A protein has these predicted regions:
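C-terminal accessory regions
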Residues: 131-268
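Conserved helicase motor core of P-loop NTPases
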Residues: 1-176
Length: 268
């Protein structure tokens, strides 16, 4: 990913052998590291890059990488708020990342892929064997396949335990059924699961019954970023330092530092 003129080359070479505990600015013609100590400045710089990404419809322009899911969720909420400066759930141009595979009307949403919100319309989603729910008919753009498709996305307040209980009840009934009744119950289960997407994990009794289909796509875990490349990467090294195992820390540092094609801004 880095050229011979990248200032990150020697850093990556070191990270192949051992983790790094002291970080400093490092500039190169084709790639530089900028260390930032203030979270506010780190987020402000990231927002500037995301504004370009949204304008250019370039989902591989920039990404924030962190270690923990909690930190990723906090970044996604913060960047969403800073970008749009209102309380609306969705906006035209919003970047959404898929957190599960989902098939609908011939289109397939792929786990860990980014999608761009082209338009959305408030609607009522008829969730079979449950009730009618508030939601949105969202038109998403798939940059990789140069195609658009629509998905039914539940409003956040509809992603609750009541729905999780219905899903788990039907699933349990299907598991415990026999013969034709078993086949029928599984058909009911898949009809239900295929009727909507969610922006939140659905829980009951402390267990995740269904993972979120989509979340905001501004920040992801370093683990989820493997295999991806971005023009610019923002790394929360403070969060990555939570990994106390030496080899785990080295791997996280190497993966995060090698995602960029040019520059890295690091929070330390």
């Amino acid at each position: 990913r880095q050229s011979e003129k990248s200032g990150l080359k020697d850093i990556l070479q070191t990270l192949r052998e051992s983790p790094i505990h002291q970080w400093n600015n490092c500039e190169g013609e084709d790639g530089s590291l900028f260390v930032e100590s203030k979270l506010e400045n780190f987020c402000r710089k990231a927002v500037s890059e995301f504004k370009y990404e949204i304008e250019a419809k370039d989902i591989l322009h920039t990404k924030i990488l962190a270690y923990t899911n909690t930190r990723v969720n906090n970044y996604n909420k913060a960047i969403h708020k800073l970008l749009w400066n209102d309380d609306n759930f969705l906006h035209k141009g919003e970047i959404l990342m898929a957190y599960e595979n989902f098939k609908k009307d011939g289109y397939e949403v792929t786990n860990s892929m980014d999608y761009i919100v082209e338009e959305f319309t408030p609607t009522i989603i008829d969730v079979p064997y449950y009730t009618k729910c508030k939601g949105y008919l969202v038109k998403l753009y798939d940059e990789y396949n140069n195609a658009s498709f629509k998905i039914p996305l539940l409003a956040p307040e509809e992603c609750n335990e009541d729905l999780a209980i219905v899903i788990e009840t039907i699933r349990t009934e299907a598991i415990n059924s026999q013969g034709y009744d078993r086949k029928k119950k599984w058909s009911i289960y898949y009809d239900l699961m295929g009727s909507f997407c969610t922006s939140k994990d659905l829980f009951t009794d402390g267990r995740c019954i269904r993972k979120a289909t989509f979340k905001y796509g501004y920040a992801i875990t370093t683990h989820r970023s493997q295999g991806s490349s971005y023009d610019n990467v923002f790394i929360d090294m403070k969060d990555i330092f939570r990994a106390k195992d030496k080899e785990t820390l080295r791997q996280l540092q190497y993966v995060s530092m090698s995602r960029t094609r040019s520059d890295i801004t690091m929070l330390l």
